[in-house]
Structures are given as structure tokens and as C-alpha cells.
From Swiss-Prot:
Membrane topology: Peripheral membrane protein
Gene designation: atpC
Quaternary organization: F-type ATPases have 2 components, CF(1) - the catalytic core - and CF(0) - the membrane proton channel. CF(1) has five subunits: alpha(3), beta(3), gamma(1), delta(1), epsilon(1). CF(0) has three main subunits: a, b and c.
Protein family according to the UniProt entry: Belongs to the ATPase epsilon chain family.
Compartment list: Cell inner membrane
Protein's recorded name: ATP synthase epsilon chain
Organism for this UniProt entry: Vibrio cholerae serotype O1 (strain ATCC 39315 / El Tor Inaba N16961)
Length: 140
């Protein structure tokens, strides 16, 4: 029996990172984790920094880091419009670790709510990148 699939596009302002048939994908929405399968109810929601986990035909997986954006689901198709999107294999672990260290340092030395909010946002992005790197390495 053939797997039930639908079309997914993952795009950023710079380029299209993925376009093809998928069995499912997961993304971090504004209200939590979303798992999207064929036949999902139409949806338009914000996404948080994190990963898009794509399950292609035959269970092959791909991971893409997104810094935020929106996801739109329509019958037979879905689109992730990301502010920034980077394939897992293109992420730099050393840069992500350094960004995490700097954000943690800023949180400890913050001066006001805006400093804290900005540092917390940077920390979330760095942690998300490190998670995508880890999952991409495990996949190989």
C-alpha cells in the first residue's frame, strides 16, 4: 500500500529549502508542537524558533532549522514561510555553541526587561540550532 502524502514547501526570504511530497512534518507552533499529516484541517499559525522535521517517502527524514515565521496548511499542501531557514547539515556547531554562551552571559548580566527578552530569544535560537545539528548527525 502506498503512503499517503502531500506537498510541502519550506522557504525563507533567501531561498526555497525544500519542495516535495512528504508523509508528515513537525514544527514548533506558537501554541506548541504541531504534527501535520495528509488531511490536516486548514491552519495558519506562527512558528517559533526550532526545527522542521520532515518525513519523506519511505520514512527518510530531513531537519531544517527555522528562526520563526508562519506555517499554512491547506488541503493537499503545506507551506512553511521562515524568517531564516538553514538545513541541518549547513549549521555550524561552533557558532551555535558560541551564540548560546553569549546569550547565557547576557542573561546573567542583563539590565532591564528588553535585554533579558532579547537574550532569551537568542538563547532559544542557539539551542534550537544545536538540537537540529544533533538530530542531523544521528540521522547519518
Amino acid at each position: 500500500m502506498a503512503a499517503i502524502t502531500f506537498h510541502l514547501d519550506v522557504v525563507s526570504a533567501e531561498k526555497k529549502l525544500f519542495s516535495g511530497l512528504v508523509e508528515t512534518f513537525q514544527v514548533t507552533g506558537s501554541e506548541g508542537e504541531l504534527g501535520i499529516f495528509h488531511g490536516h484541517t486548514p491552519l495558519l499559525t506562527a512558528i517559533k524558533p526550532g526545527m522542521v522535521r520532515i518525513v519523506k517517502l519511505h520514512g527518510h527524514e530531513e531537519y531544517i532549522y527555522v528562526s520563526g515565521g508562519i506555517v499554512e496548511v491547506q488541503p493537499g499542501t503545506a507551506t512553511v514561510l521562515a524568517d531564516t531557514a538553514i538545513r541541518g547539515e549547513d549549521l555550524d556547531a561552533a557558532k551555535a555553541e558560541e551564540a548560546k554562551r553569549r546569550a547565557e552571559e547576557r542573561i546573567l548580566n542583563q539590565h532591564g526587561d528588553m535585554d533579558f527578552a532579547q537574550a532569551a530569544s537568542e538563547l532559544a535560537k542557539a539551542i534550537a540550532q544545536l538540537r537540529v545539528i544533533e538530530l542531523t548527525k544521528k540521522r547519518r
